[in-house]
A protein has these predicted regions:
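Class I SAM-dependent methyltransferase Rossmann-like catalytic core
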Residues: 181-243, 261-265
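A short glycine-rich, Lys/Arg-flanked "PGG" loop and its adjoining helix->strand segment in the class I
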Residues: 414-426
Length: 470
């Protein structure tokens, strides 16, 4: 993993940054030592911050919801932060399992169809899955591993896994991962059989509350967000020029996602740029003053974004690869979004070659202009336990949290919503594609639920919820 020095966080820790600069000598030595201006303070949620949320959840029985004193809350919220951050390693283990299932950069073996196809519940892995485990182990021990394989190698080293034990560890991890995927699917089936739509939504909205925190990302989610914002504009919920500062919570890092599992291009982040371009395309923002802040607790994500922003200050563009699988059968709107992504904030670039094993995959590449890449600032913040303390009128006008709050229970989601509300300007918009807690701070007004399909056959898509800060 990239080296990481996490800033000290006290009751109101300050992360300092020079205006428009992420770089000093320590940054060059360790790219994830993030330096911000005194304007940006990361604070734990106080008892006063969450008093409204605690009242709503007093009888829920969820951990932390029955706390009635400030001192007890201060202890609990810090313990909660440590517990949430401890889930990052399990998320990395999940990403490594996806790399075993679908990766093409280290082997020409056929990809597996899904985690469930790796073997039977509680039983050994299939020979096809074991062959891919062995291929990854060989790659990890090779002299010149690629970027993702180096990450796996460094992760195993950090976990204290000896070279001779790597195969056993990765096998057990894949078995665990496959069993969990089956359990998630079973929970959804059982909720569907209940006939209770509230039960279905609750199950979907908290499905991964005990799972490791994944850093996966997807282009199509950003298409759904743009379509949703267009709808809000049509309904007069958003005005031209109303967005200056955007917060992207959990921006993601394209390691090997659970849908397509591509790993033949460098690690990349997309959502910060997608949010920026959408705001510009819809005339919600102006190129000269738009800013994007990413809030994440994953050191690898923060380091990656800090590095790209630093390199942009030196005039280096940021290149993203945009794959499209013809088997996904995108509707025309999705195809148009993919075809024109990056036209406002960059120029078309030469894409990397697609591996022969990935038939039907087309690739576009976009070189994002340094003037836009340099406008992204990463913040090490856990939105469930912390908030960015912002001066008046310096809050966020648009907040995006996709595929992230599903990793938390209803009380944790409500805490996140309380944090988000406190970071927003009045009239600001909050978007999420997770079914969130119906019990949340009154300062967030529910506006709409917008459905967007990613397939002409309607097999999958997103439901985007929108809220407005009163």
């Amino acid at each position: 993993m990239p080296c990481y020095t996490r800033p000290m966080i006290g009751d109101a820790a300050t992360l300092t940054r020079r205006s428009r600069s992420l770089a000093t000598l320590p940054f060059l030595l360790c790219c994830s030592t993030l330096l911000f201006s005194a304007d940006w303070k990361i604070s734990y949620l106080t008892f006063a911050d969450v008093s409204e949320t605690l009242r709503m959840f007093a009888d829920s029985g969820l951990p932390g919801s029955n706390i009635s004193a400030s001192a007890a809350w201060n202890r609990w919220i810090r313990d909660q932060d440590r517990e949430v951050r401890a889930r990052i390693d399990r998320g990395e283990e999940d990403s490594i399992s996806n790399l075993i299932l679908y990766g093409t950069s280290y082997t020409s073996l056929p990809r597996l169809e899904s985690a469930e196809s790796a073997g039977k519940t509680g039983g050994p892995l299939s020979e096809a899955a074991m062959a891919r485990v062995r291929a990854l182990v060989i790659a990890v021990h090779s002299a010149q591993p690629n970027e993702r394989i180096r990450i796996v190698r460094d992760f195993l080293k950090r976990k204290g896994i000896a070279a001779g034990d790597a195969s056993h560890y990765l096998t057990a991890n894949l078995q665990r991962f496959a069993d969990e995927q089956r359990a998630y699917q079973q929970k959804l089936v059982e909720a569907g059989h209940s006939g209770d739509m509230n039960e279905v939504l609750s199950t979907r909205g908290t499905l991964y509350q005990n799972r490791g925190l994944s850093a996966d990302t997807s282009l199509m989610t950003n298409y759904a967000l743009e379509d949703t914002l267009s709808s809000l504009i049509a309904k007069n919920f958003l005005a031209s020029g109303s967005v200056r500062r955007i917060a992207v919570i959990g921006p993601g890092l394209d390691f090997t996602n659970k849908h397509n599992g591509y790993d033949f291009y460098p690690l990349q982040t997309i959502q910060p740029f997608a949010a920026m371009e959408t705001a510009l395309r819809l005339n919600l923002a102006k190129p000269d003053n738009i800013e994007v802040f990413t809030l994440d607790l994953n050191p690898s994500v923060n380091a990656h974004i800090a590095r790209l922003a630093h390199e942009a200050l030196s005039g280096r563009p940021y290149i993203v690869q945009l794959p499209r699988d013809s088997e996904d059968e995108w509707p025309s709107g999705a195809e148009n979004y993919w075809q024109h992504f990056g036209e406002i904030i960059g120029v078309q670039a030469k894409p990397l070659p697609v591996p022969q094993t990935l038939t039907g995959v087309t690739l576009r590449a976009v070189s994002i202009a340094p003037r836009f890449a340099s406008r992204i600032t990463p913040l090490d913040a856990n939105v469930v336990t912390q908030r960015v303390a912002l001066p008046p009128a310096r809050g966020f006008d648009l907040v995006i949290a996709t595929n992230i709050l599903v990793y938390y229970d209803r009380f944790q989601q409500a805490l996140a919503m309380a944090s988000i509300a406190r970071m927003m300007n009045p009239g600001g918009i909050f978007l999420s594609n997770d079914a969130l807690s119906a019990h949340h701070v009154q300062s967030l007004e529910f506006l709409d639920r917008h459905s967007v399909s990613f397939s002409t056959k309607g097999r999958f898509g997103d439901n985007v919820l929108s809220y407005r800060r009163k």
